[in-house]
Amino acid sequence: MVSDASKKKAAQKKAAAAAKRGGKAAAPSKSAATSSNGVDSLSSGVDALQISDRTCTGVLCSHPQSRDIRIESLSVTFHGYDLIVDSMLELNYGRRYGLLGLNGCGKSTLLTAIGRREIPIPDQMDIYHLSHEIEATDMSSLEAVVSCDEERLRLEKEVEILVQQDDGGGERLQSIYERLDAMDAETAEKRAAEILFGLGFDKEMQAKKTKDFSGGWRMRIALARALFIMPTILLLDEPTNHLDLEACVWLEESLKNFDRILVVVSHSQDFLNGVCTNIIHMQSKQLKYYTGNFDQYCQTRSELEENQMKQYRWEQEQISHMKEYIARFGHGSAKLARQAQSKEKTLAKMERGGLTEKVARDSVLVFRFADVGKLPPPVLQFVEVSFGYTPDYLIYKNIDFGVDLDSRVALVGPNGAGKSTLLKLMTGELHPTEGMVRRHNHLKIAQYHQHLAEKLDLELPALLYMMREFPGTEEEKMRAAIGRFGLTGKAQVMPMKNLSDGQRSRVIFAWLAYKQPNMLLLDEPTNHLDIETIDSLAEALNEWDGGLVLVSHDFRLINQVAHEIWVCEKQCITKWNGDIMDFKRHLKAKAGLED
């Protein structure tokens, strides 16, 4: 007899399948953009075309008034490719989830689907999806943060109207005051200022118009808005990408206290360890759940996979023995034939009950930079260099240092201290105001920075783009060169606009490596890379025999590859006496945060 639970599950799957055939989300809830808090309106504006490229189905199984979310039979398709198939999404109130998975598996697509309510999220749950920077307007950064709390502004305007009435507003006014008190409305501006300060905005910057900030700083303002609103569901996609190390430390400590539902995609293992209470792993088109932070996830996953492989091998050995026995004695004497039939029944029972699957291993990428040999020092030397974009404002003053092919240097310091400027002085893109930069005649420098992605012709496939960049190269040789950075098969020949940001980053690394430099300057190379790819990059850099200067907000990558930490601050460059984790503890102490 079929159980009620089985009937319910079958009905859910049937509903999901019907919705999928219709190309719409199952049981869609109305947008909360019209709700009292208006949070969703902040993250709206995705084109209809983008939405039509994505198909989502799922059945809400948790109670509509519950603070926890459980969606079964979840499937997500993007450009006709299945990203998630018949899985379960479970988000519990008070938990902070790290969403992991290889580049291109659909992490950002899943966040967008949740943020756009393309899967059934209860109406009373407000969502903030940090996906893009705020608009450039005449509003100050502080005003941009405070003004985003539409519910508070609406209630304060209603108070102004009610107090003018003859009855003084009555019960309605009292209920509004209670709500404003719960929202801590009187200290709204103070809270907004504290958040902005933590993200690197001093008082002068808080008064500055948003249109006068770069895209990276406007993304910080958008992050400040998300933290200020405190939505029920907060979705963050690589929130540390535009932050310096100091702001990363502050954000990590701030999110530790987020007591609603947080889902964060991050390539920083250190950040995930500090923030997350749970991990969701996207693998084989399924969502798998683990309790604990990133390190605990790694340990638990390793133990589970080891046990799974032991069970798999045992089952396969049993199956092999039984099949061999059946084939050998199935037509023998009556006694042996009965035993063979018994084993046949046992085998059929095992198969009906479901056999243990072989562990699906994530494909391990192996990056490789060609060895270039040594050059006699000095290779790159700064002699009493001063530099400023204007005569009245010097970023560096009388700095002296040298970098050789044995150097493995990480540049750290607050945003605006001149880390990227120093890299441009090294390449010759900028010239010193005073002093001299000496480069060896045979020094070949290659620089990675985020703006390289903007130069990619996204209409072209990666293979054709590389063939045009390096004319005369044989196609097979170029395929191999791109493949060394984890882009293989169809990914090489489809337009790059259909690749994930992480896959495009791999194209850039392949382009840099093909230049065969003997010194690499890497400015935030981990943005958009998954954790496995970052580990492969670190391994390749450690095996390479060239010089390295690194700017990164990823504490773990710095710890993996850097031999020296140079602090850029107050027009100077100072060598830090310790490793990067010592520097992190220093930043926490400086900000008055507990270790």
Curated annotation (Swiss-Prot):
Residues 13-36 have a biased composition (Low complexity). InterPro entries: AAA+_ATPase (IPR003593), ABC_tran_Xtn (IPR032781), ABC_transporter-like_ATP-bd (IPR003439), ABC_transporter-like_CS (IPR017871), ABCF_EF3_subfamily (IPR050611), P-loop_NTPase (IPR027417). ATP binds at residues 101-108, 413-420. It comes from the Eukaryota. Residues 1-41 are annotated as: Disordered. One of its GO terms (cellular component) is plastid. SMART domains: AAA (SM00382). Residues 69-309, 380-595 form the ABC transporter domain. Keywords: ATP-binding, Nucleotide-binding, Repeat, Transport. One of its GO terms (molecular function) is ATP hydrolysis activity. PANTHER family: ABC TRANSPORTER F FAMILY MEMBER 1, ATP-BINDING TRANSPORT PROTEIN-RELATED. Belongs to the ABC transporter superfamily. ABCF family. EF3 (TC 3.A.1.121) subfamily. This is ABC transporter F family member 1. It comes from Arabidopsis thaliana. The gene is ABCF1.
